[in-house]
Amino acid sequence: FSTILSYVTELVEIEKIPQIYNDTYKINIDKDEISSKVQYYMPNAYDKLPAKMSKTLHQAVYNLKLDGNMFDGTYLAQPVIRAIDGHLKMILLNLEIIPDWKYIKANGYDMFEKVGAKYRLCSERYGKATTEQVKYIGNCYTFFNSNRNKLSHWDDPTAPLDTTDLLDVGRAHDLIKRTLSLIDEYYE
């Protein structure tokens, strides 16, 4: 359901998103309040993002208003997982680390190497990135990698250690805020 709703969100104007969600969830949240909160959480980035990403992040901020005792609140964080993926791909393309959008579809994120618990950009793949940008890109991919798979894919439920993660509302809200902050950091 959340995936379908997030795709619908990408297709409509930002101004219509709150009404769609208000009708879906039978609540009343003002669109101006959501836009103000996007600016609050992303003061450096809110006016620099592509339209599709902005819509997805508006949806994520809207999801911060959804509260309650849910069985699984993971779906609330789904928009920011998609947004951080798109954000990372845009940076890699803009800094000429990848030649085009198709590269990651064919090769995945092969420009990273794991060092301990973190990932870093392989030195031969820096493109036009500065030292500071290389560090940011490594942190961004580490964050993306450590959150996406355990939230978006089901692990082996028969294994002794199932790493599939389900978020309660509080943890989903925390992940949303941390992701917004990480994206905003790039534009500081």
Regions found by a protein language model. Give the residues of each.
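Residue-level detector of well-ordered alpha-helical segments, enriched
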Residues: D72-P79, C140, N147
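Flexible secondary-structure boundary motifs
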Residues: L93-G138
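Hydrophobic alpha-helical packing segments in soluble, helical-rich domains
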Residues: L76-I97
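Ampiphathic alpha-helical segments that act as solvent-exposed interaction surfaces
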Residues: F1-S35, D162-Y187
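Short, flexible helix-adjacent loops and helix caps
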Residues: K65-N69, L92, E96, D156, ...
